């Protein structure tokens, strides 16, 4: 069983794994950059912002 490209379903090329080509890798990157793909976060992500006292000792 060979792996298939998640963009076009062609066999994967090890040079571009997990994609079959640079084109499919670029299509995937553009989808991330345009906001088409997102990683869901919990509601508490905005309620607990990072501390502003990072450099404080």
Curated annotation (Swiss-Prot):
Cofactor(s) listed in the protein's UniProt record: Zn(2+)
Residues that hold Zn(2+) according to the record: 5, 8, 20, 24
As one GO molecular function, the record gives: DNA topoisomerase type II (double strand cut, ATP-hydrolyzing) inhibitor activity
**Zinc listed as a keyword:** yes
Task: Give a yes or no for keyword Zinc in this entry.
Answer: yes
Q: How is the cofactor bound?
A: Binds 1 zinc ion.
Q: Spell out the coiled coil positions from the record.
A: none
Its keywords, alphabetically, are: Metal-binding, Zinc
Q: Which HAMAP family match?
A: DNA_gyrase_inhibitor_YacG
Function in brief: Inhibits all the catalytic activities of DNA gyrase by preventing its interaction with DNA. Acts by binding directly to the C-terminal domain of GyrB, which probably disrupts DNA binding by the gyrase.
* UniProt family annotation: Belongs to the DNA gyrase inhibitor YacG family.
Per UniProt, subunit arrangement is:
Interacts with GyrB.
Name of the protein described by the UniProt record:
DNA gyrase inhibitor YacG
Q: Which gene encodes it?
A: yacG
């Amino acid at each position: 069983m060979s792996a298939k490209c998640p963009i076009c379903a062609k066999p994967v090329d090890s040079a571009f794994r997990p994609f079959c080509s640079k084109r499919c890798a670029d299509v995937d990157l553009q989808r991330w950059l345009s906001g088409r793909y997102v990683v869901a976060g919990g509601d508490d992500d905005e309620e607990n912002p990072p501390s502003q006292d990072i450099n404080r000792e």
